[in-house]
Amino acid sequence: MSSFYTVVGVFIVVSAMSVLFWIMAPKNNQAVWRSTVILTLAMMFLMWAITFLCQLHPLVAPRRSDLRPEFAE
């Protein structure tokens, strides 16, 4: 269950950073700055979460290739 809490925790941190940047964005080109930084944070979170969860719960179990055939499954 630690994977759920890790992903949710990182999501909360990224969301807080997005809200903070929404409030503190520079005044010139504010829409460009907001969309660039918030979309960057969102995409980085998605890539991290997908990679983290794929490594935590792989679809194909790893197999050892250095075993003798009689000990292999």
From Swiss-Prot:
Name the domain of life this protein comes from. Answer: Eukaryota
* InterPro entries on file: ATPase_V0-cplx_e1/e2_su
Topological domains annotated Cytoplasmic: 25-35
Which residue ranges does the entry give as Lumenal-facing topology? 1-3, 57-73
Transmembrane region(s): 4-24, 36-56
Instruction: Please list the GO biological process terms of this entry.
Output: cell wall mannoprotein biosynthetic process; endosomal lumen acidification; Golgi lumen acidification; protein-containing complex assembly; proton transmembrane transport; transmembrane transport; vacuolar acidification
Q: Where in the cell is it found?
A: Vacuole membrane
Please list the GO terms describing molecular function.
Answer: ATPase-coupled ion transmembrane transporter activity; proton-transporting ATPase activity, rotational mechanism
| Topology versus the membrane | Multi-pass membrane protein
| Keywords of the record | Hydrogen ion transport, Ion transport, Membrane, Transmembrane, Transmembrane helix, Transport, Vacuole
What is one cellular component GO term in this UniProt entry? vacuolar proton-transporting V-type ATPase complex
- The UniProt entry lists the main location of this chain as membrane
Q: What is this protein for, i.e. what is its function?
A: Subunit of the V0 complex of vacuolar(H+)-ATPase (V-ATPase), a multisubunit enzyme composed of a peripheral complex (V1) that hydrolyzes ATP and a membrane integral complex (V0) that translocates protons. V-ATPase is responsible for acidifying and maintaining the pH of intracellular compartments.
**Assembly and binders:** V-ATPase is a heteromultimeric enzyme composed of a peripheral catalytic V1 complex (components A to H) attached to an integral membrane V0 proton pore complex (components: a, c, c', c'', d, e, f and VOA1).
* Family to which the UniProt record says this protein belongs: Belongs to the V-ATPase e1/e2 subunit family.
* Stated name of the protein: V-type proton ATPase subunit e
What is the organism field in this record?
Answer: Saccharomyces cerevisiae (strain ATCC 204508 / S288c)
